[in-house]
From Swiss-Prot:
Keywords: Cell cycle, Cell division, Chaperone, Cytoplasm, Isomerase, Rotamase. This is Trigger factor. It comes from the Bacteria. Involved in protein export. Acts as a chaperone by maintaining the newly synthesized protein in an open conformation. Functions as a peptidyl-prolyl cis-trans isomerase. It is found in: Cytoplasm. One of its GO terms (cellular component) is cytoplasm. PROSITE patterns: FKBP_PPIASE. GO terms for molecular function: peptidyl-prolyl cis-trans isomerase activity; protein folding chaperone; ribosome binding. Belongs to the FKBP-type PPIase family. Tig subfamily.
Length: 441
């Protein structure tokens, strides 16, 4: 086998491979002879079909099979010979495939980049913490109440937090416009789901009232023709629903698994759950800072094939949320690559950099961390042990957890080298979701 390789640009490589004709011919003949033992052709007994007839009938098809198998096998032999790591599948361009002649093809592909890690001692991390106060617990209890609340019609004026059922008709310069009318529309006041001023104009109205409100469409409104336009909406309120919170009693506590101990025990459980949530948030934010520091200090070329693969994985993950309804959708149009590209590039860059950290510092996945992560995931299920057993019996799931454990060990390693500053903030600030990062490497 003859092999030559050249760099075309950046991470792209062009591999030219030549395979002697006799290798192909010998394999074709071998497969045809094997087929002749079992093939059935009218006029011949099984196993007695002349080789010439078998070759005439099946030769071309078998040759194409052999070519495909040989090209695939020879490609991976060639990249091992040249000590390159393909990132993604190659594009194969046949150059010479005629029978009786040496086979030649060109494989174009990207390789994994060389990652030169910068020193990791200058990383600065802020580790936030918070004391969970009675006020924090009160707020969480109210949130739990709201999750169990009911809605009842009220006769008073509407206020923020109420739900109203309305008809509206909008006009600009006295003329109605597309999308400016609705009947029986339900709206939660204060939700911010309508243009600025709309909900505020309705606040204070009672069921049965009709009145006009004046608003201005935002400069960046999604309908271009309506941007910056002044409009008048005639609003009719049909119903105002006020939220009714459930009482804090034994029945309410039981819904959260507290069947004895009353309010004191319930608040203890709430605080315990808040503490767990806080620790998860602290851990996640420290990890996010470490990963950001890795990205900022290490630049890496990204193979387009890896980024595209990550885009596909992210799209598939989102598709699963649609369930059966996704089958008839044009997902490429609904979920275009650009929607995922920045985040996919970030994930790909981090994967390459973290992999290099693992290699350089010989980081190993800790079995205790793997067990801890599995137990944490299983703790929310009715039968945690059944879930734990399932994880350990599923190679793919276990591999995913081991990868996460490896990442945790990398974070631990970098924290040992980093300058860590502790800071106390409010509970809400600690658990506040992080802004998604999408820096390009």
């Amino acid at each position: 086998m003859q092999v030559s390789i050249e760099t075309t640009s950046g991470l792209e490589r062009r591999l030219t491979v030549g395979i002697p004709a006799e290798i192909i011919d010998q394999e074709v003949e071998k497969r045809l002879k094997q087929a002749a033992k079992t093939v059935r052709i009218n006029g011949f007994r099984k196993g007695k079909v002349p080789f010439k007839v078998v070759k005439q009938r099946f030769g071309e098809g078998v040759r194409q099979e052999v070519l495909g198998d040989t090209i695939q096998r020879s490609f991976y032999d060639a990249v091992r010979q040249e000590s390159v790591r393909p990132a993604g599948q190659p594009s194969i361009e046949p150059k010479q495939m005629d029978e009786g002649k040496d086979v030649e093809y060109i494989a174009t592909f990207e390789v994994y980049p060389e990652v030169e890690l910068k020193e990791l001692d200058n990383i600065e991390i802020t580790r936030y913490d918070a004391e969970i106060t009675d006020a924090d617990i009160d707020k969480m209890v109210e949130t739990l109440q709201k999750g169990q609340s009911s809605w009842e019609p009220v006769k008073r004026k509407s206020k923020k937090g109420d739900k109203v059922t309305i008809d509206f008709l909008g006009k600009i310069d006295g003329e109605a416009f597309d999308g400016g009318e609705a009947k029986g529309h339900q709206l939660e006041l204060g939700s911010g789901s309508m243009i600025p001023g709309f909900e505020k104009g309705i606040t204070g109205m009672k069921a049965g009232e009709t009145q006009p409100i004046n608003v201005t469409f935002p400069d960046d409104y999604h309908v271009e023709d309506l941007r910056s336009k002044d409009a008048e909406f005639e609003i009719t309120v049909h119903e105002v629903l006020g939220e009714k919170l459930p009482k804090l009693d034994e029945e309410f506590y039981a819904k959260f698994g507290v069947t004895e101990g009353g309010e004191e025990k319930f608040r203890e459980e709430v605080k315990s759950n808040m503490e767990r949530e806080k620790q998860r948030a602290i851990k996640a934010k420290v990890k996010e800072q470490v990963m950001n520091a890795l990205l900022e200090s290490n630049s890496v070329d990204l193979p387009a094939a890896l980024v595209q693969s990550e885009i596909g994985a992210m799209r598939q993950q989102m598709v699963q949320q649609y369930g059966q309804s996704a089958q008839n959708l044009d997902l490429q149009a609904l979920l275009p690559d650009d929607m995922f590209k920045a985040q996919a590039e970030r994930r790909t860059a981090l994967a390459l950099i973290v992999s290099e950290v693992v290699k350089k510092y010989e980081v190993k996945a800790d079995k205790d961390i793997v067990r801890s992560l599995i137990e944490e995931a299983a703790s929310t299920y009715e039968d945690p042990q059944e879930v734990i057993n399932y994880y350990y019996s599923n190679e793919q799931l276990l591999a995913n957890v081991e990868a996460a454990a490896l990442e945790e060990k990398v974070v631990e390693l970098l924290l040992e080298k980093a300058t860590v500053t502790d800071a106390t903030v409010s509970y809400d600030e600690v658990i506040k979701p992080q802004e998604p990062q999408a820096e390009e490497a």
